[in-house]
From Swiss-Prot:
GO terms for cellular component: extracellular region. Keywords: Secreted. Forms a heterotetramer with Tsi2 consisting of two Tse2 dimers and two Tsi2 dimers. Formation of the complex inactivates Tse2 enzymatic activity. This is Toxin Tse2. InterPro entries: ADPRTs_Tse2 (IPR041018). It comes from Pseudomonas aeruginosa (strain ATCC 15692 / DSM 22644 / CIP 104116 / JCM 14847 / LMG 12228 / 1C / PRS 101 / PAO1). Pfam families: ADPRTs_Tse2. It comes from the Bacteria. Toxin secreted by the H1 type VI (H1-T6SS) secretion system into the cytoplasm of recipient cells. Acts likely as a NAD-dependent cytotoxin towards both prokaryotic and eukaryotic cells. Changing R14A: Complete loss of toxicity.
Length: 158
């Protein structure tokens, strides 16, 4: 049995703000093979599902909202990435999704628009079909693993 996954056609970058995560995510900025095979990965590609209620932090809308049936549908939002590193200057770094990375079959990467101010094109990683939150998070975690694996392969000329 063969699986031919759609692959990313260009390198994409996800801004990482270390304060948004419970653990140390710094190692994801320069991952290794061991991290690609880890049982658990940091939720680097998870969108904001709920508006944060943190005192002193301006409220912002969720990146994706579930329908009445509890499912997250295609073209209703998702995870923001850009085609250029360092777009968000306040970020601690960027998680790299190299060109040629396998896109999990239940996700899609949609090109949105060019942002003149940021001088970068915005893309959204979103569900390719309706799915529950836990399934979406699992698919996004698999995308992280695939990106780490592809980084490792590219570093070795594979």
């Amino acid at each position: 049995m063969s699986y031919d996954y759609e692959k990313t056609s260009l390198t994409l970058y996800r801004a990482v703000f270390k304060a948004n995560y419970d653990g140390d995510v710094g190692r994801y900025l320069h991952p290794d093979k061991e991290l690609a095979e880890a049982a658990e990965v940091a939720p680097l590609l998870h969108p904001t599902f709920d508006s944060p209620n943190t005192p002193g932090v301006p409220a912002r809308a969720p990146d994706i909202v579930a329908g009445r049936d509890g499912l997250y549908a295609p073209d209703t939002g998702g995870t923001s990435v850009f085609d250029r590193a360092g777009v968000l200057r306040r970020a601690d770094g960027d998680f790299v999704i190299p060109d040629g990375t396998d896109i999990p079959p239940d996700l899609k990467v949609k090109q949105d628009s060019y942002n003149k101010r940021l001088q970068a094109t915005h893309y959204t990683i979103m569900p390719a079909k309706p799915m529950y939150r836990e399934v979406l998070m699992g698919q996004l975690d698999n995308f992280v693993r695939n990106a780490i694996r592809r980084q490792w392969e590219k570093a070795r000329g594979l």
